[in-house]
């Protein structure tokens, strides 16, 4: 591998722009369909767009702030010294593959990925498990670096520090490289998007791409007739299953009667009263129109409906 660019004093916008030039570790799980928060559809649109999306949130901020601490705890637990990479690296054999490493292990052909984990996600790390999209990220780093192994140190807030060692598997890396390069040549280069996978974030992206409708335009969807039939079939199945689910809930309520709680092997059930106050918007608009208008705002969205014409 080679250093593509130093990240010391590199503005974040420039750093994000460099990452558009190839496939990074965080792209790997999404391309493989393993990332619950990001899809190949989103990776594609990020790569072809000139827009730099500087997305940040509290979880990402905490992850950055605690990276030093996680690396320190890793060194304490293993006795291995680590150092910052301070660069975007590029595979010389497969130049499409880029990587930002959290840490490199001093004196070894190895690296370290630092993670911070919510206690609500602790089960995903139980019994030696690693979330699949993180494992894909590490395999990507092994593919870029050519190193022998990679460590993952995960701080589960308030619980424990988990450390895993991932050893290079040449067949796994070969398969990963093939899929990443295929994604690039099949989708990014010809600018043909991959199919969305049904996740909420794909819906948000599609709505963002096409915010405004043209009332004078009607699309011919004949080529999607089979998909529309499949959707109708699924909708009918879901409706039937929802009714069956509701019938079971009704039986449980009849058994509980006025009990607030119920138990069964492997289950805890609650049926408790609650009160909430809601604004009567119709009355407010009628009796206090000035106040209603003062605290109202226009929200624009496109309503999507499919009606089956029998």
Residue spans of the language-model regions?
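Accessory terminal regions of nucleic-acid processing enzymes
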Residues: 1-310
């Amino acid at each position: 591998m080679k250093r593509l660019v130093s990240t010391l004093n590199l503005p974040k916008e420039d750093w994000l722009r460099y990452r558009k030039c190839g496939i990074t570790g965080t792209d790997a799980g999404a391309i493989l369909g393993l990332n619950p928060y990001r899809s190949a559809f989103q990776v594609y649109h990020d790569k072809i767009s000139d827009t730099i999306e500087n997305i940040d949130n509290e979880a990402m901020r905490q992850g950055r702030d605690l990276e030093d601490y996680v690396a320190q705890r890793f060194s304490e637990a293993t006795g291995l010294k680590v150092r910052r990479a301070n660069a975007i690296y590029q595979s010389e054999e497969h130049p499409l593959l880029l990587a930002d490493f959290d840490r490199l292990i001093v004196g070894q052909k190895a690296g370290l990925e630092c993670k911070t984990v919510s206690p609500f996600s602790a089960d995903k790390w139980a019994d030696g498990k690693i979330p699949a999209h993180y494992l894909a990220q590490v395999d990507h780093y092994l593919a870029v670096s050519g190193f022998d192994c990679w460590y993952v140190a995960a701080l589960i807030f308030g619980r424990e520090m988990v450390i895993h060692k991932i050893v290079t598997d040449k067949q796994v890396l070969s398969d990963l490289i093939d899929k990443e390069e295929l994604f690039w040549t099949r989708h990014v280069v010809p600018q043909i998007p991959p199919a969305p996978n049904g996740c909420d974030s794909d819906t948000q992206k599609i709505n963002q791409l096409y915010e405004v409708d043209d009332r004078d335009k009607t699309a011919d969807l004949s080529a999607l007739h089979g998909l529309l039939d499949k959707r109708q079939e699924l909708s009918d199945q879901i409706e039937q299953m929802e009714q069956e689910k509701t019938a079971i809930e009704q039986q449980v309520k009849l058994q509980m009667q006025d009990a607030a709680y119920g138990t069964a092997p492997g289950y805890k059930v609650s049926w408790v009263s609650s009160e909430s106050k809601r604004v009567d918007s119709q009355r407010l608009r009628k009796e206090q129109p000035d106040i209603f208008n003062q605290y109202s705002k226009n929200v624009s969205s496109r309503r999507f409906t499919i009606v089956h014409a029998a």
